[in-house]
Amino acid sequence: MPRLAGLKELDDYRAHLAGMPEPKRRLWVCGGTGCLAGGAVELFKALKTAADEKGLADSVELKVDLSGCRGLCEKGPLVEVMPEGWFYQKVRPEDAEEIIGESLWSGRPVERLVSAPESLRAEDLPFFAPQKRLIMARLG
């Protein structure tokens, strides 16, 4: 992103972003301290590479981003597949091709990366179930 010199440029850039289409799919890689220490940057790069090999990187079809901390640090690195909300735990760079292939191409969750088959989404986990995300609802 270019450096913005003033408020006018910021407003212009904001208008530009507002006019861009939302990606149909998004992979959020937790960028919190615990996940970063566990290899989230390498995972992020591996997901970008795998998406690029499928012709999806930086397209309207898919966006791969680092998010803020999700709070479940001992299970990191974490990945959330949107809009489905599939929540993967203890993800490694070696899992990137499977995530891109299964979750994005085939439309199926990678069940070995979720805590239990009945807990595919973050909201299904006991840690997140009582929480209501307000300010950080669009984490990232």
Residue ranges and their predicted role:
Residues M1-G140:
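Feature of Fe-S/electron-transfer and energy-metabolism proteins
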